[in-house]
């Protein structure tokens, strides 16, 4: 299983997680020239940008630890572009992280959803 496949498994799990809790997924893999946002969703008057981090082992630490300050700033800039291009207005904008650990077979062993992560 390559990194792209691992990432897709994590994003698929996150979309199911969000949908089952009343979120409406608006976009997946929203790309601009300098990066992307994994998932954009809404729940009521809240617009949520979700960074999904998925790993098969903890050799490099917990998945959430790889969301650096620079990555957070990049996501915020992409979010600004998204809101401006779509001309959206929400009462609140939130940045969440989904951290997922997979088994070698690609099954979700552990996950943690962090609302308002940054």
Swiss-Prot record:
CDD domains attached to this UniProt entry: PoNe_Nuclease
Domain of life: Bacteria
Gene3D superfamilies named among the record's database cross-references: 3.40.1350.10
InterPro entries in the cross-refs: Restrct_endonuc-II-like, tRNA_endonuc-like_dom_sf, UPF0102_YraN-like
GO molecular function: nucleic acid binding
HAMAP family: UPF0102 (MF_00048)
Family listed: Belongs to the UPF0102 family.
UniProt-recorded name of the protein: UPF0102 protein Dtur_1530
């Amino acid at each position: 299983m390559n990194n792209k496949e691992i990432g897709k498994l994590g994003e698929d799990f996150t979309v199911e997680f969000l949908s089952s809790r009343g979120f409406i997924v608006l976009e997946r893999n929203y790309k601009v020239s300098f990066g992307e946002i994994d998932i954009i969703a809404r729940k009521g008057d809240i617009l949520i940008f979700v960074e999904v981090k998925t790993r098969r082992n903890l050799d490099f630490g917990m998945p959430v630890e790889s969301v650096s300050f620079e990555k957070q700033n990049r996501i915020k800039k992409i979010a600004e572009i998204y809101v401006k291009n779509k001309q959206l207005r929400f009462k609140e904008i939130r940045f969440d992280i989904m951290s997922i650990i997979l088994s070698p077979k690609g099954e979700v062993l552990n996950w943690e959803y962090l609302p308002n992560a940054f």
